[in-house]
């Protein structure tokens, strides 16, 4: 294939498909992390292309916290049914027994127990040696320096000072017993690339990405959508209707919406062309402390 004859989106697509096929061929028990967002939707689409007309040779894994938006759960179940994928859902039983929730315990503890520990439990339970993730280098500074093949020790920890060179699309997947890797096929994509590809390929996405009037409360400079009756209103807070959408999706009490008029994919793309802020400005977990994402990844976060 002559890469010079491809558009930049087709080059990114080809690179991602190559990575997905490499991992499927090289590792004994891979899995694709499925968090239901736009990046997961693109990654799943690429994986289906990589093995078409066959089925995916690995399952999807959703590490569930119990606090995703209702529309995300509906979209997940619809997608799995439509494509005939094998879906594994894991929720940290210890966290459930402790009653961990983001309102009472805060974003850091909730993320550590329900996401990081939940992910490590699932990887250990099924013995996965490679896990695909939809992270991109343009999202956050610690992800910017992470390799496509991100090696983890037997405790699932990442050491940014111990990464392997990746030259000319050659990847060294040699691991010792108990070790594993996280694989990021979308590393070189940008947020704009993702939206342009979704539009080009007509990929279905969670409706929360499109602007519409929604019930929100303003808290700590963020617009939190009231998704169910578990909302813990603080003194003086009032639920109001605002036309908002989400640039990134996570647990609804920890994910801020943005005011927007973008009701269609072309409108989102136009909005991205003039945006000067990071999509992760709406993630409360990134505000826990300086370097919080790198710390979480060192502890086993994806």
UniProtKB/Swiss-Prot annotation:
<keyword id="KW-0067">ATP-binding</keyword>
<dbReference type="Pfam" id="PF01507">
    <property type="entry name" value="PAPS_reduct"/>
</dbReference>
<dbReference type="GO" id="GO:0004781">
    <property type="term" value="F:sulfate adenylyltransferase (ATP) activity"/>
</dbReference>
<dbReference type="InterPro" id="IPR014729">
    <property type="entry name" value="Rossmann-like_a/b/a_fold"/>
</dbReference>
<comment type="similarity">
    <text>Belongs to the PAPS reductase family. CysD subfamily.</text>
</comment>
<dbReference type="GO" id="GO:0070814">
    <property type="term" value="P:hydrogen sulfide biosynthetic process"/>
</dbReference>
<dbReference type="GO" id="GO:0000103">
    <property type="term" value="P:sulfate assimilation"/>
</dbReference>
<protein>
    <recommendedName>
        <fullName>Sulfate adenylyltransferase subunit 2</fullName>
        <ecNumber>2.7.7.4</ecNumber>
    </recommendedName>
</protein>
<keyword id="KW-0808">Transferase</keyword>
<dbReference type="GO" id="GO:0005524">
    <property type="term" value="F:ATP binding"/>
</dbReference>
<dbReference type="InterPro" id="IPR050128">
    <property type="entry name" value="Sulfate_adenylyltrnsfr_sub2"/>
</dbReference>
<dbReference type="InterPro" id="IPR011784">
    <property type="entry name" value="SO4_adenylTrfase_ssu"/>
</dbReference>
<keyword id="KW-0547">Nucleotide-binding</keyword>
<dbReference type="InterPro" id="IPR002500">
    <property type="entry name" value="PAPS_reduct_dom"/>
</dbReference>
<comment type="function">
    <text>With CysN forms the ATP sulfurylase (ATPS) that catalyzes the adenylation of sulfate producing adenosine 5'-phosphosulfate (APS) and diphosphate, the first enzymatic step in sulfur assimilation pathway. APS synthesis involves the formation of a high-energy phosphoric-sulfuric acid anhydride bond driven by GTP hydrolysis by CysN coupled to ATP hydrolysis by CysD.</text>
</comment>
<comment type="pathway">
    <text>Sulfur metabolism; hydrogen sulfide biosynthesis; sulfite from sulfate: step 1/3.</text>
</comment>
<comment type="subunit">
    <text>Heterodimer composed of CysD, the smaller subunit, and CysN.</text>
</comment>
<keyword id="KW-0548">Nucleotidyltransferase</keyword>
